[in-house]
Each structure stands twice: as structure tokens, then as C-alpha cells.
Amino acid sequence: MHLAFVWHFHQPIYRDPDTREYILPWVNYHAVKNYHQMARLAEEAEFPGTYNFVPCLLEQVLEYVGGSANDPFQAALEKDPGKLTYADVRLLGKIVPGETNARRLQELAVKALFSSPLTPERDRDGLLDLRKEVLADLLPSYLRLRQKGLAELTTTPYYHPILPLVFDVRSADGDSLPELPFRHPEDGKSQLAKGRAYFGKIFGFEPAGLWPSEGGVSREVARAASAAGFRFALTDENVLWKSRPAPHVPADLFKPYLAESLALFFRDRELSDLLSFEYQKWPAAAAVEDFVAKLEARRKAAGEASILVIVLDGENPWEYYPGNGVPFLRALYDRVKRLEGFTLTSLAGYLAAEPARDEIDLVPGTWLG
């Protein structure tokens, strides 16, 4: 059985359109703490994965790298401790509650910007310098992983819109639809094309793969994505079961389908959600063994030439795990790599060997429904 892990990286635009100042620090925070960590762990374990970068996130990362982005949190970290204002102390106190000494508060807050199991011991100024180094090397580090065969890079429509609703809001189920029609396929097509082109400008190649925001797909979206140059997209198994006539066979999940000339992979919802929302409550070893047992059960049900796809947020879950998820991910990567009967793969690589053949009459949907 082939196995693909897809890690989704997304932050919306936090830049004020008038002042150009960053209102919230989350691009800064996740880039240094989590995107860097995911690249480090993949390289350390030589563990192949797929990483999905939203274009508007890339835009903001590059502004931080170039020094044109600043946010109140970063400004408070860089101030002389004696010049911290009450507002600065309150802001840093949200990261490090209970600390009243200004210098100590800054030191603890800047340490919180990093994944502690992967960070060398340095003082505040040393960590601020390290932050700049990490940001500057962030995107190149993923290109290096790609060159080593350890990373497939994919993207999303530019500003992370839910495409079926942009193409036609009437594609949504339910009674709570706006009275006025909303149908702007031209905007959806523009965001697909703009996102793919911007990704290509930054990384030097245009991506084959697409994670449509929230896994939002429809026949119209699939047609537009294919026309924009994407060869495959990913969504949730919920969409597969809505689109396939009953009875549903579990093995149907473990292969790609064709919709409007676009290959579609459907993620395993249970396994993706266990990593996102459940395993942080478990001891790492027990969580990994439970995950492996579920993988083995799926392999037995899937048959030959099958692929199991796991897609989840690659940034937010880890703060709820001990050690920012590092001990768990190390254990998971090590155990999965040693599993017999599984091959870690890229989605494009799988399609090259096993092209999608079965057509699917795609029903509009997202991972939510």
C-alpha cells in the first residue's frame, strides 16, 4: 500500500491594507516555530511528505524575510526592556502569563517563538538573530527537501477561498443562503491561476497539485483547476461518499478518481483527524501503535495498487502535543518508515505509475460537508 502524508500550511493576510502594518503575529510565529520544525524533522528522519503552501502565506513570509513586515509582538520582543510599554507587557504576557520582570518576560516570550526541542540555548538577542536565519532559510529548506526526494510541494487558490461558493453559492446545501445570487467563477479562476503562478515565481516551478481551500470541490472547480494546469487535487472522503452511489465499499477510498480531467485523491478522515485532534491526549508510544494498527487494517481491506492519503493542518495541532509534537512526530516517522507492506510516496509519483481511471460525478462539498 502506498501512503502519502500531506501537511497544509495556511495563514490569512494579517497586513492592514492602509497602514501595511501586521495586526497579528501568526505568520511570524508559525514560520519560526512550526514550518521550520516540519522541515527539520523530515530531513532528520528522511521521511517523505507533501507540503501545501497557500500563496498569501508565501507572500507574508517573504515580507518578514525582507524586513518589510513587522507586528506588535515582534516589536515588543526587540525593544530595550526598560522601554516596554504597558501595552507591550500585556501583549507578551499573553504568551508568557504571570511573569512581571520585563527582561525575563522578553526572554521567555522569544523562546516561545521557537520549537524548544529543536532550539539551541541562546539569550534574547541570540534567538532574535536565529529567528532571522530561520526565516531566510525557510523556503529554501523545502526546496532542498524536494531535491532530495523528501518533499512534494503543492498549493491552494491565492487567498484561500472556498471555491464552490465563489463559483456559485447555490452549490451549498441548506436554507441559509443569501437572497441575492452570488456567482463569480471569474474570481475563482483568477485565484487558481494567480496562486499557481505566484507559487511558480517563488519556488521556480509550477505545482502539479492543489489542496482547494477546506477541500472545497465541485465539477466546475475541477474543470477550472485542470484548465489552470493542475494535474491533481485533494479533498475529503466525505465528498467521495456523497458522489458515489451506495453501497459504499471501504476500498473505494484508496484510489484516485477523475473529474473533468483532474485526478482527485480523497483523504482518510479518521486518520487525519486523529493526528489533528486526538493523539495529543495520548502517550506518544500508544498513539503511534494505535495509528499503525489502523494503517494495517486499511491495508488488508484495500487490495493491490492502493494509496492511503492523510491530509491535515501542519501548524496548529503541535502546540497541544508535548514538546510541540516533536517527540510524537519522531516516533511516528520512525515507526511508519519501518512498516512492512507500505511505501511512502508523492501523489504525482503515484499517478505516474497508477493513473486515475475511474470517472466520478463530483458532488459539491468540503471536508465540513
How should each PLM-predicted stretch be described?
Residues 175-212, 294-311:
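CE4/NodB-like, metal-dependent polysaccharide N-deacetylase domain
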Residues 1-118, 248-369:
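Active-site and substrate-binding clefts of carbohydrate-active enzymes
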Residues 52-57, 157-160, 211-217, 348-351:
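Short, solvent-exposed turn/loop segments enriched in Gly/Ser/Thr/Pro and often Arg
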Residues 162-165, 174-186, 191, 238-240, ...:
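Positively charged, amphipathic and often flexible ligand-engagement surfaces
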Residues 41-46, 138-155, 170, 226-227, ...:
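Acidic (Asp/Glu)-rich catalytic clusters
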Residues 27-38, 131-140, 180-198:
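Aromatic- and glycine-enriched glycan-recognition loops and surfaces
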Residues 84-137, 147-182:
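Active-site-proximal, well-structured secondary-structure segments within enzyme catalytic domains
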Residues 189-247, 316-339, 343:
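Catalytic domains of cell-wall/extracellular-matrix polysaccharide-remodeling enzymes
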